[in-house]
């Protein structure tokens, strides 16, 4: 990472840890995210916390619902930037790109959930906007789901396919420890 690098933490909210969700992979993702967060804070590097706010009444991410709140261990400090989004891509209608450019940030490390949704959407846009983009493979996770043909896919399958979609085209995908050594 040759440029000033921000850590983007995507949708690490209370609702993402509810037991009613489908089976997920990377049970240690929160620990890896916490390690990266501590590393960024120690270096006094920029951290951005992205929060999903649903436009669907009754959603766990509807304003005022407990699912909207950040997970306690990963909650932002007062000086850390918070971005509220209502679509998967953290750059759409949020000012995130402008905020990064105003601070001369040319590189981002993206972590959080879910790999195939908000993480992938945000990473694609970051890469398309010219940011040097990294994804921490062990600091992201996905949920099991059916593919377009109706075949059940494990959370690992969904996660790994999403990372394959991103690596080499929109981002460089590496484990958290490797990214900490580079930062």
Where are these regions (language model features)?
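Active-site-adjacent betaalpha module
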Residues: 2-6, 34-38, 42-43, 55, ...
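N-terminal nucleotide-binding beta1-loop-alpha1 segment
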Residues: 7-12
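Short acidic, Gly/Ser-rich segments with clustered Asp/Glu that frequently serve as metal-coordination loops
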Residues: 15-19
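A short alpha/beta connector and helix-capping loop motif
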Residues: 21-49
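Conserved non-catalytic scaffold segment of RNase H-like nuclease domains
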Residues: 49-55
